[in-house]
Amino acid sequence: MSNYPKSGKPIPQISMFEVESANIEAVGYHPETMTLRIKFKSQNIYYDYFKAPSGFFIEMMKSESKGRFFSTQIKGQFKFEKIEL
């Protein structure tokens, strides 16, 4: 397991679930660390959003538009780090 570039903390292993979306490829959640991971289709990079309550993952998975949910509910709301896995 590697570490986050900024904080140096270990990067958790997170199971990813492919989603139907024009921009988002997959989403995953690690409940112990409250980390929401999102992989966008346009990049081979993952974004980990920290201290995200599990409800955000559940609601995102249920949402009709994953991209709209991300833009209105997640983007700008949580600290994040870009990682390459």
Feature names for model-found ranges:
Residues 2-85:
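Acidic/histidine-enriched, beta-strand-rich ligand/metal-binding domains
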